[in-house]
């Protein structure tokens, strides 16, 4: 299964826990607004956070409240971004990005999830060298989407790579060019399965043992259930 299929499956799982997903998006939006201002046209981090929330069908009222909370004087709790790295079962490399107001709580929880599921939490840098930070835009096989036209628009806008998959198209950019490529595609009327700057694995790991598959699924589920966890990246090749 390609990356697009993985994203579609993940979105299906998230539909069942929509309230929790909205809470995570609201936190990310509020922090982005607090740090860079309430206007997404002048705050790239806020614009990306809003786009991600909308991709998960978060209502505009919820988004507006989160922006207002973050932009208000002395608004909200003090959150910080902390990234954890480690190995899951079968040697799968895992990166966990969190947004927390209590790093001791978050560190303890993340370590527990790894230990509980046949993995181990490592030190900073222990697996990140296996990933590249890239902008990734996924476009589905919608009506009227021409592969050739989409590729031309993406590459002319500054995309690094264009990959055709079974479920759609993957457009890769540098982190610096992500916003301009995304905005150009959106202006041309393309709709996205997802669009974000993320850590993309250089190689993937296939799990063949049933016990490893079960533990890896459980590890991802437990991490996704944690309110402090914003994003999870791994090099597990989901078949």
From Swiss-Prot:
| Record's keyword terms, sorted | Cytoplasm, DNA-binding, Transcription, Transcription regulation
Location in the cell reads: Cytoplasm
InterPro entries (UniProt xref): Integrase-like_N, TACO1_YebC-like_2nd/3rd_dom, TACO1_YebC_N, Transcrip_reg_TACO1-like, Transcrip_reg_TACO1-like_dom3, YebC-like
Principal place where this protein is found?
cytoplasm
Q: Name one GO molecular function term.
A: DNA binding
Q: What does the record list as GO biological process?
A: regulation of DNA-templated transcription
The entry's cellular-component GO terms read: cytosol
Hey, which family's this protein in? Belongs to the TACO1 family.
Protein name as catalogued: Probable transcriptional regulatory protein CD630_07950
